[in-house]
Every structure is written in structure tokens, then in C-alpha cells.
Amino acid sequence: MLKKIIFGIIIPLLSTGCFANSTTSNFSKKDVAKTNDVSTQKIIDDFSAYAGTIKPEVREEIQKYRVEIVDINKKKRELYNKLSKEAQNFLAEQQKYKQKLSIPKLLTENHPNNNANANANSKDNNDKDME
């Protein structure tokens, strides 16, 4: 269901995007590249200005943090590679199932009717507790 909704939204957007690209526009590719370069450079300049306000102690702390994260990720890869092929396959399948579960769970949590039913049930339970 979610896939149908996503594809229903993405395909028209992609097709209109392709159509817009195939028609003539006010900007050439060079103009767009210049605009992207200018906005990219502005972002870089803004970040450089912000980074200049950070204390050296904080920078060192962040650098140590990143080094430790790299070490942790290396250790995780080593542990994973030590697993048997069967165990690695199991973990891969488990991840697929977790991903399948997370999408419907989000849909039911955000669906207004389910929230209304949950609120009604909790109200009924509260009323029973008071009796």
C-alpha cells in the first residue's frame, strides 16, 4: 500500500521533471551550474564562519569522538566478518523483516482512526479503573 502511494507520487513528479528538462528553459546548464556553485560556496563560507567560532577544546573533543567512532565501526566489521556465512545471512534476513515491520507500524501509529480507537480504549480502561 505504501509502495503504491510512493510510486503514485514519485512517477508523476519524475515525468514532469523530465518533461521540464526536455523543454526550453530560461537557464542553460552553465547558468544552473553557476547558481549551484554560488550557493554551494555560500554554504561553505557560512560553515567556515561558524566553525571559526568553535573553541579549540571542542574541536579536539569532536576529533577524538570521530576517531573513536571509526575504531568502533572497524571493530563491528571485524566481528561481523568473524561470523559464519549462515549467521551473516540470518542477520541480513532479520534486517529485511525489521524494515518490513517498521513501515506498517508507522502507518498504524499515524492513522487517525487507529489513534481514535486507542484513545477510546484507554478511556474505557480508565473508566473501569475508577469503578
UniProtKB/Swiss-Prot annotation:
Residue numbers spanned by region Disordered: 102-131
Protein location: Cell membrane
Keywords of this entry: Cell membrane, Coiled coil, Lipoprotein, Membrane, Palmitate, Signal
Membrane topology designation: Lipid-anchor
A GO cellular component entry from the record: plasma membrane
Compositionally biased residues, Low complexity: 113-123
Coiled coil: 57-102
Keyword Lipoprotein tagged: yes
Lipidated sites in chain (S-diacylglycerol cysteine): 18
Signal peptide: 1-17
Primary localization class, coarse: membrane
Lipidation, N-palmitoyl cysteine type: 18
Entry keyword annotation includes Repeat: no
Name of the protein described by the UniProt record: Uncharacterized lipoprotein RT0080
Classification lineage: Bacteria, Pseudomonadati, Pseudomonadota, Alphaproteobacteria, Rickettsiales
